[in-house]
């Protein structure tokens, strides 16, 4: 099964125009490893609200560190879960390093993470759910940032930052913190025993922008009941960003079911 099999199922959805305030739009910019390409290791996106608030979603490994010239002003950093390909254990040394198939991720961000380093450099708030905020607050402090910039938003309510509403929604995925991020003796013990530290459940997000656009960011997940009851029927997002990875996340057919039957956005 290839990702191509998803496209016929959702192509019609993607052609439907979004109904938002015509005087203002949300700008969406992918920050992939290769300019002009969409590669399988790419995660990061910047969402810019009409009022100028800029949100970085899952910096991962393709944002070339805190000095990446594509970042610009960042007000909020979202991290769906603690795995290295989303939090950012290492990253490209520069944009376009390596290739789509073999990205150069030789620059280490450990033990702080790419996301934390970017938040410290830009002064952004890191907005997460579950048990992640306390861990990230400590990481911010260790990296020379303000621990108060780690903001909690658990399932059930929204935080409003810079005029943009942000909430977390359930995702069916593991969320252990690897020993590499923990560091010191405890980190070594975790690596030696092959286990990870507890961070609570993984999350997705619903982000509501000042022009009324609601966006569902699935994070890594499988099919969940909440995609219908919470995301689709309560938040009613017009745009969805759906992670597809088959064994590790929803497969192409499963993702098509989530989009067409549960969330029902107007664009994907």
Residue ranges and their predicted role:
Residues 8-17:
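Bacterial N-terminal signal peptides
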Residues 18-22:
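Sec/Tat signal peptide C-region and signal peptidase I cleavage site
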Residues 23-27, 31, 118-253:
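Metallo-beta-lactamase
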Residues 33-116, 144, 175-197, 221-235:
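Pre-active-site segment of Zn-dependent metallo-hydrolases
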Residues 52-55, 76, 164, 213-215, ...:
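Structural motif
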Residues 53, 121-125, 263-267:
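A short helix->loop->beta-strand "cap" motif at the edges of active sites that frequently abuts
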Residues 111, 252-259:
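Charged helix-capping and loop-helix junction motifs
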């Amino acid at each position: 099964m290839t990702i191509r099999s998803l496209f016929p199922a959702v192509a019609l959805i993607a052609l439907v125009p979004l109904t938002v305030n015509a005087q203002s739009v949300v700008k969406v910019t992918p920050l992939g490893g290769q300019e002009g390409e969409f590669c399988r290791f790419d995660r990061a996106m910047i969402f810019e609200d009409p009022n100028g608030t800029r949100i970085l979603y899952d910096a991962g490994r393709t944002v070339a560190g805190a000095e990446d010239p594509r970042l610009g002003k960042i007000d909020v950093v979202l991290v769906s879960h603690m795995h290295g390909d989303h939090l950012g254990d290492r990253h490209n040394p520069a944009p376009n390093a390596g290739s789509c198939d073999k990205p150069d991720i030789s620059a280490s961000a450990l033990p702080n993470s790419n996301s934390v380093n970017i938040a410290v450099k830009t002064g952004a708030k890191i907005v997460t759910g579950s048990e992640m905020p306390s861990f990230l607050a400590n990481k911010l402090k260790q990296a020379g940032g303000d621990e108060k910039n780690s903001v909690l938003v658990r399932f059930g309510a929204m935080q409003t930052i810079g005029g943009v509403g942000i909430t977390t929604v359930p995702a069916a995925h593991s969320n252990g913190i690897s020993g590499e991020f923990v560091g010191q003796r405890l980190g070594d013990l975790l690596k030696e025993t092959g286990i990870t530290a507890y961070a609570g459940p993984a999350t997705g997000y619903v982000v509501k922008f000042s022009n009324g656009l609601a966006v569902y960011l699935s994070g890594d997940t499988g099919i969940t009941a909440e995609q219908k009851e919470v995301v689709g029927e309560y938040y009613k997002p017009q745009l969805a960003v759906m992670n597809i990875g088959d064994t590790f996340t929803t497969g192409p057919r499963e993702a098509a079911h989530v989009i067409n039957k549960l969330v029902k956005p107007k664009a994907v």
